[in-house]
Amino acid sequence: MDFVAKNLTKLRETNPLVQNITNYVVMNSTANSLLALGASPVMAHAMDELEEMVSIASSLVVNIGTLDEYWIPSMEKAAKIATDLKKPIILDPVGAGATKLRTKTALKILDFADISVLRGNFGEIAAVLGEHGKTRGVDSVAYDSNEAIELSKNAAKEFNTVSAVTGPIDYVSNGKELYAISNGHPMLSKVTGTGCASTSIIGAFSAVDEPLKAAVSGLTVYGISAEMAFAEAPYPGTFQAKVYDWLYRIDEKLVLEKAKVNKFEI
């Protein structure tokens, strides 16, 4: 897809500031992923600075991975400010379906905020749609390609957003169009925070294109980087470092050579 390659160049030219209200587990790896790609990360969740920070950010990423009584109001306030300012908001409902708190928090944000992209695994997206029993902790335990296609379309329509259901094949839909992305590698599941990083990378691309193409761009670039990383480092520890390297090294030429993206009209 030509637009993916062009968006990569645009991102590096503009160096967008991506505000992340994310979980403790992935702050470092997410920030490094964004820096390697060519974006600028900021991890800011203090209530007293949200208005200032959201106003200067290019996009907002909300990740519910480590919730508590302080972070939930921060996420909600930031999402409201970003909605008022018409900034792209990317929501990652980490572990939705595993506990009532996670599902409730994700649904509340989806209800009042203008979410540009909802990115999660099969179980998480199924949970926010009310289809239970497919999540264990923060990991999806069931995946069926046909179900994932329907899930992506249905979530997009239900929440009036772009829905990205990630797994062996990533499906991205706005309810009218559907993209299938076959890039990536199973080793991503052996390193914590890779899904969270992909969400923040979508946030970076949301600064340079509309939500559907931003999500496709982010997942394609991250998937190709993972493939290239595994070819050089087939073990989890060195693989993670190589993903950073390839997020830095990937260029338009490599995207055009390696992208495995198909578009379908719904």
Curated annotation (Swiss-Prot):
Family annotation (InterPro entries): Hyethyz_kinase (IPR000417), Ribokinase-like (IPR029056)
Cofactors, names only: Mg(2+)
Ribosomal protein listed as a keyword: no
Keywords of the record: ATP-binding, Kinase, Magnesium, Metal-binding, Nucleotide-binding, Thiamine biosynthesis, Transferase
Protein residues bound to substrate: M43, G193
An example molecular function term from Gene Ontology annotations: magnesium ion binding
Pathway annotation: Cofactor biosynthesis; thiamine diphosphate biosynthesis; 4-methyl-5-(2-phosphoethyl)-thiazole from 5-(2-hydroxyethyl)-4-methylthiazole: step 1/1
Protein EC: 2.7.1.50
Catalytic activity: 5-(2-hydroxyethyl)-4-methylthiazole + ATP = 4-methyl-5-(2-phosphooxyethyl)-thiazole + ADP + H(+)
Cross-referenced Pfam families: HK
Positions with a binding annotation for ATP: R119, T166
NCBIfam families the UniProt entry points to: PRK09355.1, thiM
Family label: Belongs to the Thz kinase family.
Protein name: Hydroxyethylthiazole kinase
Name of the encoding gene: thiM
